């Protein structure tokens, strides 16, 4: 890899927010307990959505749709006027409907309460529970209006799955076996949902950027083609500049993780 490459410093630097497992589409995330109530920054709220989604055993697309809904809401409404954690619970509940992965509202309320208030007992069926339930139902209608009832997203997942299968056939079997290219690509995609760019970026380009950055992480070059053009075989319309932009944003996510999340860790 040329010394002037903009992402050379990432070689041999694995993702820091996740522990990669055999299930590539569902990486095992950092289990550090976070005191979310100390921050209302969107990055932290997305981290909260992802933790709650995993505890609800929601599927990958549901969690990513919930994150996308929050980004879309944040782009149109002032977060200072709304409780971000009420809206994140609402995003999860609505995302379950959008992706046909229905989440019981009672489960959403209980999980959100337990993650926000880790030292408290589960929320009893009293006034606080029913008030929270009513608030989420009303917030769901508000969220739909803010999003102009456009709540479906073209996620990069199907593109990434296709590109990884193609790349596996392209590369030497021993390289694919030795390095967790697929798992790292999936992890980077999931982590990119901390950034609102994922809502507006071309999903094919996002998928290719995650794959390219995973290759660079392990210092791997695709054979029989220039290392910086292999993705054009997959999608000829992809812009190199856009690829670099997305790869840079992925790395910024990992920088923000230590800045915003680690500082909120419960000791």
Specify the residue positions occupied by each region the protein language model found:
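C-terminal functional regions that serve as terminal interaction/effector modules
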Residues: 1-20, 200, 205-267
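A eukaryotic "domain-start" boundary segment
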Residues: 1-61
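Structured all-alpha helical bundle cores of eukaryotic regulatory proteins
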Residues: 39-208, 212-241
């Amino acid at each position: 890899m040329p010394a002037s490459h903009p992402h050379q410093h990432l070689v041999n630097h694995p993702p820091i927010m996740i522990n990669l497992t055999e299930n590539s589409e569902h990486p095992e995330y950092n289990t550090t307990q976070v005191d979310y109530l100390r921050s209302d920054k969107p990055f932290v709220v997305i981290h909260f959505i992802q933790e709650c989604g995993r505890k609800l055993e929601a599927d990958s697309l549901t969690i990513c749709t919930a994150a996308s809904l929050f980004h879309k809401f944040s782009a149109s409404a002032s977060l200072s006027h709304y409780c971000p954690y009420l809206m994140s619970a609402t995003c999860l509940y609505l995302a379950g409907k959008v992706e046909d992965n229905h989440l019981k509202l009672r489960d959403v309320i209980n999980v959100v309460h337990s993650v926000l208030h880790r030292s408290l007992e589960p929320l009893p069926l009293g006034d606080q529970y029913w008030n929270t339930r009513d608030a989420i139902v009303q917030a769901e209608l508000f969220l739909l209006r803010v999003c102009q009832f456009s709540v479906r997203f073209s996620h990069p997942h199907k593109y990434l799955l296709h590109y990884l299968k193609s790349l596996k056939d392209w590369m030497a079997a021993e390289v694919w076996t030795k390095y967790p290219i697929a798992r790292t690509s999936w992890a980077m995609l999931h982590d990119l949902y901390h950034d609102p760019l994922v809502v507006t970026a071309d999903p094919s380009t996002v998928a290719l950027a995650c794959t390219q950055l995973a290759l660079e992480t392990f210092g791997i070059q695709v054979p029989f083609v220039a290392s910086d053009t292999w993705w054009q075989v997959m999608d000829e319309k992809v812009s190199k500049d856009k690829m670099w932009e997305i790869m840079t944003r992925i790395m910024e996510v990992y920088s923000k993780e230590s800045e915003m999340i680690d500082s909120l860790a419960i000791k």
